Amino acid sequence: GQLIDRTGVRLGLQFPCGPALEQLALQSRVSYKIKPSMQGANCSLSGVENQVDKRLQAGDAPADIARFVLSSVSAALKGMVQAVFAEYGQLPLLFAGGVMSNTILRQELETAFGGVFAPPALSCDNAAGVAVYAALCSKELE
């Protein structure tokens, strides 16, 4: 979320920047193949911020920068899930938090892994994801 907001501010978008950055990214026709910086299931996105600065200085289109950032976040999330699966097996997935209200990321993660997502309107708060998880757990106990 921090990367998305920082990028949005650099692009002149109003904070919080998630929805506006998503709309901007949808205007891009560029496709990025990103190799995330991973250590186990942990990722670092600081290099992405540096790349954003370089792309801004190079005059890249704002829509392409927005798409680059969301592609980077998607690659990191996919890398995290793959690392968890490699260590623990195919666990059920629950995606929650503000970033999960992004339809681009939701679609890519759902296509790759399935999982449970709260409706976008409820994804802006981690508490909604925790509530969904609690409901799923209570159904399993019945």
Language-model features: locations:
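Adenine-nucleotide phosphate-binding core of ATP-dependent small-molecule kinases
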Residues: G40-S46, N50-L94
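Conserved phosphate-binding/catalytic loops in two-lobed NTP-binding clefts
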Residues: L93, E110-V130
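Glycine-rich phosphate-binding loops at beta-strand->alpha-helix junctions
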Residues: Q90-L109
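C-terminal charged capping/lid subdomain of soluble metabolic enzymes
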Residues: A118, L136-E142
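A short helix-loop
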Residues: Q2-A63, E140-E142
